């Protein structure tokens, strides 16, 4: 499954070397937790500050498992 939405970054935790476990409050789907791969890269690091407004693409394989975000 996949969906696109807008939301605010409300929590982030470091996961492995270059990923984040992020909690985003979205307009249509509420509070969603997912991984952001490559979150420590120079290109995306500036966008991932708490409270920032983000356009996200969320992909997941199963409703019971965590998915991952692509941030725009």
Regions found by a protein language model. Give the residues of each.
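A surface-exposed, charged beta-strand/loop segment in the N-terminal or early-internal portion
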Residues: 1-72
């Amino acid at each position: 499954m996949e969906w696109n939405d807008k939301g605010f970054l409300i929590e982030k935790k470091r996961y492995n070397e270059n990923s984040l476990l992020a909690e985003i409050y979205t307009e249509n789907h509420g509070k969603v937790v997912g991984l952001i791969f490559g979150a420590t890269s120079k290109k995306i690091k500036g966008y991932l500050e708490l409270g920032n407004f983000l356009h996200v693409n969320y992909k997941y394989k199963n409703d019971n498992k965590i998915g991952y975000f692509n941030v725009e």
